[in-house]
């Protein structure tokens, strides 16, 4: 939440789970809520991943729209991707999904009307299990 525009009454901020809010406005900490102020003059993804590394966070799930996901993919900041494709839904318009680079298909599973494709980043294939 770069400019802290999200309403504070969202469940995201209820402090039931440890939450980190990366932003350009403030640095503050509560029980399970950390506001981490980023340097607006630096690469945001580099700064976020460095901060997470320093906090010893070893796994991150990135959920977002195509622009957010494409940013992580473009910087090579992904190890695994799960792509869910609904085989029965037809949309006339919409946003294009991100384009994955260096992907290796590991497996596919069918779940109801969905196909779940598991990809790994080909750059790291030696360490994948």
Explain the meaning of each model-derived region.
Residues 64-71, 88-90:
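Small/polar glycine-rich anion-binding or flexible loop at a beta-alpha turn
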Residues 93-129:
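Conserved histidine-centered catalytic loops in small-molecule metabolism enzymes
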Residues 1-58, 67-70, 125-128:
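Active-site ligand-binding patch in enzyme domains
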Residues 1, 7, 85, 93, ...:
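Residue-level signal for pocket-adjacent positions within structured domains
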């Amino acid at each position: 939440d770069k400019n802290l525009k999200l309403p504070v009454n969202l469940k995201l901020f209820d402090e039931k789970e440890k939450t980190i809010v990366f932003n350009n406005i403030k640095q503050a900490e509560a029980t399970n809520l950390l506001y981490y102020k980023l340097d607006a003059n630096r690469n945001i993804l580099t700064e976020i991943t460095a901060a997470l590394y320093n906090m010893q966070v070893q796994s991150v799930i990135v959920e977002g729209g195509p622009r957010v996901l494409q940013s992580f993919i473009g910087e090579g900041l992904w190890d695994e991707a799960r792509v869910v494709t609904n085989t029965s839904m037809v949309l006339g318009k919409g946003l294009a999904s991100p384009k994955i680079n260096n992907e290796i298909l590991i497996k596919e599973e069918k779940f109801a009307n969905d196909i779940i494709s598991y990809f790994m980043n080909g750059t790291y294939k030696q360490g994948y299990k």
